[in-house]
């Protein structure tokens, strides 16, 4: 017993020292306070939005799906009459979480390991889409094998096709913004991330301008030396779309956002607002003229992180 007490004290002190050294005053890995799969009251007068975080991925500070989804949940709570419900590890434990959702959001690893394509889940999501439910994929979640992308493209208007799309890290200088509810309150910004581009667009169109129903939301000019696929190299000097909205023929809405690799980018107000606005728009919630409220304390970048087997390093906004 004495040995167990000593070990407990040792590990407790080690954790405390790590917290104190970072100057946080809290355990950055404590995820226990994040409410999971909490359903709204039966008399909810508003929209339920389901956010699904992927499992642990990449190194510290990157692909922080749990922490990033928790950030989004807290941001969405700042909009009246919205009830965000968060699930973890790629899929809800209780699939009834999806019942009555106005929008579903997936922030997770994609392609062959995409949680959405396992078993009969695509069919279950198709049933939601048939009801006009909104569809949002963030970062790696926009990446599908072509056999699955052929379905998802009809929900989102475009997807990352591993045969032709590309995923470099570069500084996206977002200058021109279209007039759209998603861009309300969003100012031009420049931010480094793993911005995917050269998407596979609905209708098998090579250019987003030809993709019916798709509105480019964020566009920037990538360095030509980032065009790592033969298809991407066909379009040297082309401004590329890194986030887009889709008005589905059935009246539903979709949104794809290729950023979100670097967790620190949630500290950027315009980065946050464009994603929150998009989720609200896909849920058919009126986006305020000045954009959604997205108040955020940068110290919260260090909350709810996944433990990834490396010493803790404080996450700060870019340039800090």
Predicted regions and their residues:
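Catalytic beta-strand/loop cores that center a nucleophilic Ser/Cys/Thr
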Residues: 27-37, 161-250
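Extracellular/periplasmic catalytic domains that process cell-envelope and extracellular macromolecules
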Residues: 42-46, 77, 96-100, 128-131, ...
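Helical hinge/lid and interdomain linker segments adjacent to catalytic or ligand-binding clefts
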Residues: 20, 25, 57-137, 141-144
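Sec/Tat signal peptide C-region and signal peptidase I cleavage site
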Residues: 14-18
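Structural recognition of the beta-strand scaffold that forms the well-ordered cores
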Residues: 48-53, 83-86, 102-108, 129, ...
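Extracellular ligand-binding/catalytic regions of CAZymes and related secreted enzymes
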Residues: 19-44, 71-74, 78, 224-226, ...
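Bacterial N-terminal signal peptides
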Residues: 4-13
């Amino acid at each position: 017993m004495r040995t167990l007490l000593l070990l407990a004290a040792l590990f407790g002190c080690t954790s405390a020292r790590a917290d104190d050294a970072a100057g946080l005053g809290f355990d950055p890995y404590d995820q226990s306070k994040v409410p999971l799969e909490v359903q709204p009251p039966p008399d909810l007068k508003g929209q339920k939005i389901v956010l699904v975080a992927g499992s642990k991925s990449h190194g510290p500070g990157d692909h922080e799906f749990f922490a990033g989804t928790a950030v989004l949940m807290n941001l969405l709570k700042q909009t009246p009459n919205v009830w965000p419900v968060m699930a973890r590890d790629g899929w809800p434990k209780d699939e009834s979480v999806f019942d009555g959702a106005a929008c579903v959001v997936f922030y997770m690893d994609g392609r062959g390991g995409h949680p959405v394509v396992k078993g009969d889940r695509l069919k279950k999501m198709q049933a939601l889409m048939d009801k006009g439910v909104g569809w949002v994929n963030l970062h790696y979640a926009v990446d599908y094998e072509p056999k699955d992308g052929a379905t998802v493209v009809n929900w989102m208007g475009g997807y990352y096709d591993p045969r032709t799309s590309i995923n470099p890290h570069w500084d996206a200088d977002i200058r021109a913004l279209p007039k759209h509810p998603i861009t309300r309150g969003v100012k031009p910004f420049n931010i480094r991330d793993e911005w995917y581009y050269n998407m596979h667009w609905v209708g098998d169109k090579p250019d987003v301008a030809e993709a019916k129903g798709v509105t480019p939301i964020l566009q920037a000019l990538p360095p030509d030396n980032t065009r790592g696929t033969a298809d991407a190299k066909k379009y040297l000097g082309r401004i590329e779309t890194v986030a887009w909205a889709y008005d589905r023929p059935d009246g539903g809405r979709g949104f794809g956002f290729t950023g979100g690799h670097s967790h620190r980018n949630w500290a950027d107000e315009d980065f946050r607002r464009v994603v929150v606005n998009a989720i609200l728009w896909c849920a058919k919630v009126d986006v305020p003229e000045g954009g959604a409220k997205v108040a955020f304390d940068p110290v919260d970048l260090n909350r709810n992180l996944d433990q990834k087997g490396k010493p803790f390093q404080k996450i700060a906004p870019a340039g800090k």
